[in-house]
């Protein structure tokens, strides 16, 4: 209740702002890819490598989509629910509270992006996920509408699930 007050979730952004949010996120993909290359060059200790390997095996199992029903299910659990839930938590609540604490929207965006990435417990995707979190944070800050990063987040995850389903591509680098 208290934390969700002031999020203006009843205010829809309109299709233009939603599309603009998606385009802004897509425009940041080169930065995200660069951060992936930097992240990939950081050596991991053996325990982290093992952890990454287990996480990748789990993701491969989840993203093996043999039927349209499994594809739709994955869109719901990997795109729609995280788009809503993670944005409510990390941008709507955490970023907002950190902003109030530090009196700095930029600090709030980057601290919440760091926590967003850390919570995912994937070392090899840490920097690109943090960059995506920052982009989503800036979308929320600039528009003042939480639906914009929710839609962009769901689109980002959904397009990756759809690409894997349609192409049968290897998901080793799925973030």
Predicted features, each with a name:
Residues 85-111, 138-145:
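Membrane-interface helix/loop boundary segments of multi-pass membrane proteins
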Residues 18-23, 72, 76, 106-111, ...:
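Hydrophobic alpha-helical transmembrane segments
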Residues 78, 82, 105-120:
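Small-polar-interrupted transmembrane alpha-helices in polytopic inner-membrane proteins
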Residues 117-175:
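Functionally important transmembrane alpha-helices
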Residues 58-70, 105-107, 167-175:
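Aromatic-enriched alpha-helical transmembrane segments of multi-pass intramembrane proteins
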Residues 29-45, 86-94, 122, 128:
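Transmembrane alpha-helix/helix-exit interface in multi-pass inner-membrane proteins
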Residues 4-81:
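Juxtamembrane helix-loop-helix connectors linking adjacent transmembrane helices
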Residues 1-8, 91, 96:
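Cytoplasmic membrane-interface regions of multi-pass membrane proteins
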């Amino acid at each position: 209740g208290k934390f969700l007050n002031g999020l203006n979730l009843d205010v829809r952004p309109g299709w233009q702002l939603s599309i603009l949010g998606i385009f802004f996120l897509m425009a940041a993909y080169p930065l995200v890819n660069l951060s992936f290359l930097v992240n990939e060059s950081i050596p991991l200790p053996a325990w982290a490598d093992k952890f990454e390997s287990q996480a990748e095996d789990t993701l491969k199992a989840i993203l093996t989509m043999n039927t349209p029903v499994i594809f739709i299910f994955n869109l719901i659990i990997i795109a729609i629910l995280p788009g809503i839930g993670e944005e409510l938590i990390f941008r709507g609540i955490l970023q907002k509270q950190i902003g109030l604490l530090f009196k700095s929207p930029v600090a709030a965006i980057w601290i919440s992006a760091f926590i967003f990435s850390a919570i995912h417990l994937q070392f090899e995707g840490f920097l690109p996920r943090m960059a995506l979190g920052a982009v989503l944070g800036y979308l929320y800050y600039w528009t003042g509408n939480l639906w914009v990063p929710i839609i962009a987040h769901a689109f980002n995850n959904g397009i990756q699930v759809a690409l894997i389903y349609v192409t049968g591509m290897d998901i080793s680098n799925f973030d």
